[in-house]
């Protein structure tokens, strides 16, 4: 089973092959993620993890297409990014892309964005997305923060269009499944 952590940095994810642009301790493969193709065969990867990387890459649609190329059918892909309204999205000068709740719908054939636009041949089911995973996973979320996350989860488009500019959440984690 091949599991890849793209843009791992210095943190080693157990059971994953770690890919980063820098040769840091724990990095298994040094590769620039703006250089295509990635050093993996078509249909060879079983699971992909990408934590706070996609916002640094100038062509995120091409990156997603490359992840799709190397993935097997039903590969699980987890991608975490700063939420576009968050101040974290803008404090890092190396961030070149910004993400809202509907960004991956352009790859999901169940969604009108994919059926009307078809910008890409890559197809992914958007299984779910989670706001502020790093807070909820560690159970460090206060009562009001948790209420806001729960509202945004139940009514993501309402939150994004009406409330997020007033009370922005920090991050989005997308859980995707490859369709082939």
Where are the model-predicted features located?
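S-adenosyl-L-methionine-dependent methyltransferase catalytic module, highlighting the catalytic core
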Residues: 61-62, 66-68, 72, 76-180
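Conserved SAM-binding loop
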Residues: 2-85
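Short, Lys/Arg-enriched, disordered terminal segments
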Residues: 1-2, 180
